[in-house]
Regions:
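Auxiliary Fe-S-binding modules of radical SAM enzymes
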Residues: 102-262
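Conserved AdoMet/S-adenosylmethionine-binding subsite of the radical SAM
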Residues: 1-162
Length: 262
């Protein structure tokens, strides 16, 4: 079945190559894609090849993506794609709550070394039924996972905003070229009531206090001046499409305005 599916995909790509001027973006987790690099090469700047690499940690990869190839196999595939002259991009997604700034930085630096046209980023957003499965897999491998972020929508919101802010910070410190990083915030994050509930939960957890009028005003101001503009920027359809390679280098960013800082 897998060989048949691959044959159908290859045939479709051959038709696109010969009978159209369409561009093609491929995203996969499978190193088997290397078998078609000869065809990808023929597309030139019309094709972008991408790998999904959320972490460099092999055991975390086994926990969250038990049926996917490990990160080292994916990195080798990217390396061979670049060596073959194929333009590449990376989905650093979904990143995991078990990794902090140091691990995220190492992943981003490793991926940036491939000179990808784009790096997409999105934090993991687990459905409730998957949490128990991941916890069980972690126990099987002798590890624990930070599943507390999935206990409520508010706890997940806090995790997601923290993760986005960390990735923005790292990209700035790496001097990543404008337009390379693409953040993919979930549309449900664009809710001021949800943001305020998250802030109230954080006040009780971190400060041991109620959500006072002063804290409520500070949170409302943060939403209006910082969080909402950031979300609106990344929810703009122009920003949800990556750059495209051209014969003289990377094309200009779709939107000439840089991403707002939070």
């Amino acid at each position: 079945m897998q060989d048949r599916r691959r044959g159908l995909v290859r045939r479709a790509l051959e038709i696109i190559l010969l009978d159209s001027d369409l561009n093609v973006r491929i995203l996969t987790r499978s190193p088997l894609a290397e078998q078609d690099f000869d065809l990808y090469q023929q597309f030139g700047t019309r094709l972008l090849f991408g790998m999904s690499i959320p972490t460099l940690d092999d055991s975390l990869s086994q926990i969250y993506e038990p049926n996917a190839p490990g990160p080292q196999a994916k990195l080798r595939t990217l390396e061979r794609a670049v060596a073959a002259g194929i333009h590449v991009y990376v989905a650093m997604a979904p990143t995991l709550p078990d990794e902090g700034e140091a691990a995220l930085r190492k992943t981003m630096e490793t991926l940036a070394a491939f000179n990808p046209v784009s790096i997409f980023h999105e934090p993991i957003n687990l459905r409730a039924e998957n949490v128990a499965r991941i916890e069980a897999k972690a126990r099987e491998l002798g590890r624990t996972v930070n599943s507390s972020v999935f206990q409520s929508r508010e706890s997940w919101r806090g995790y997601a905003f923290t993760q986005f802010a960390l990735v923005d910070k790292i990209a700035q410190e790496m001097n990543l070229a404008d337009g390379v990083l693409h953040q993919w915030p979930d549309k449900t994050l664009a809710s001021k009531p949800g943001f305020m509930r998250m802030k109230a939960m954080q006040a009780e957890r971190d400060l041991g206090s109620s959500f006072s009028t002063q804290l409520r005003k500070a949170a409302s101001d943060e939403w209006s001046t910082s969080v909402l503009p950031w979300l609106q920027y990344w929810h703009n359809p122009k920003e949800r499409v990556s750059n495209w390679p051209s014969s003289d280098g990377r094309q200009n960013h779709q939107n000439n305005q840089p991403a707002p800082k939070r």
